[in-house]
């Protein structure tokens, strides 16, 4: 019995020593082959000339400089562009493949397939409340309507800037605007806004707080009204609350990755004159109205000039989050 155990142990020991010897031999052979191969390459290298397909960059200097055979990174190769258009555009064009056609045309301007998104809206006023501006660059096409000239100017102000808003309870409280960035924004099917400024004793200045007919009317039957009153003065408000909502808003700053293109109209709507618009960068443009195909062709042709007036937003952002917070 003990003899069998000794024999088994001896067998394992011999196998282990044999395996160790074989592995050492294999390592020596591989070393010999590798070293010989490297030696041959070293000898033949000066005699062989081959094309270098790599990029030869100097060790020193700015990596932003353009070198021969290097690849430049363009804005549109790493960015997304959203083009927002009214529903009537698709209705007039009446072509199921019109977006594919435009995508191919955008490629000629350096925007690859998949980087341009076409987004339809039904009503510009509703769109301005919840614009969903997710792309790095966002271009909004807004057709001019002479009957809504002031509304369009205010809609552009909403789209091109970020706002922080809170509901107003005008039945219980007086309100005042703290500075030029503080506005009251009213929206609805019909907004009539009346105000009564108050003195330090909460008595009306030129009006009676108990009689709304003596209030000063500053907006009449408008769908959108951005109200600006004298800063630092309490006001009692009267608003047609059945058809309108009013909110106390603060302009946080420009959405620099958004541009508005006015389609048609004799004059371009200019909101840069507003002292709260800073920096004074023009991101409001106009295209002569003919047909929607002509409008889109013009946008494609000048897309890179339009983008140059904007700043890329590096992260996706639900812009509506800046509008109404309770």
Curated annotation (Swiss-Prot):
Pfam families recorded: VP7
Residues in the signal sequence: 1-50
Region of interest (CNP motif), residue spans: 165-167
One GO cellular component, as annotated: T=13 icosahedral viral capsid
Keyword check for Metal-binding: yes
Segments of this protein annotated with the region GPR motif: 253-255
Keywords: Calcium, Capsid protein, Disulfide bond, Glycoprotein, Host endoplasmic reticulum, Host-virus interaction, Metal-binding, Outer capsid protein, Signal, T=13 icosahedral capsid protein, Virion
Chain sites annotated for binding Ca(2+) 1: 95, 206, 214, 216
Glycosylation sites: 69, 238
Entry superkingdom: Viruses
GO molecular function term, any single one: metal ion binding
Cysteine disulfide partners in this protein: 82-135, 165-249, 191-244, 196-207
Residues involved in Ca(2+) 2 binding: 177, 228-229, 231, 301
PTM notes: N-glycosylated.
UniProt subcellular location: Virion; Host endoplasmic reticulum lumen
Function: Calcium-binding protein that interacts with rotavirus cell receptors once the initial attachment by VP4 has been achieved. Rotavirus attachment and entry into the host cell probably involves multiple sequential contacts between the outer capsid proteins VP4 and VP7, and the cell receptors. Following entry into the host cell, low intracellular or intravesicular Ca(2+) concentration probably causes the calcium-stabilized VP7 trimers to dissociate from the virion. This step is probably necessary for the membrane-disrupting entry step and the release of VP4, which is locked onto the virion by VP7.
Quaternary structure and interacting proteins, as annotated: Homotrimer; disulfide-linked. 2 Ca(2+) ions bound at each subunit interface in the trimer hold the trimer together. Interacts with the intermediate capsid protein VP6. Interacts with the outer capsid protein VP5*.
HAMAP family membership: Rota_VP7 (MF_04130), Rota_VP7_A (MF_04131)
Family per similarity comment: Belongs to the rotavirus VP7 family.
Anything else known: Some rotavirus strains are neuraminidase-sensitive and require sialic acid to attach to the cell surface. Some rotavirus strains are integrin-dependent. Some rotavirus strains depend on ganglioside for their entry into the host cell. Hsp70 also seems to be involved in the entry of some strains. In group A rotaviruses, VP7 defines the G serotype.
Name of the molecule in the record: Outer capsid glycoprotein VP7
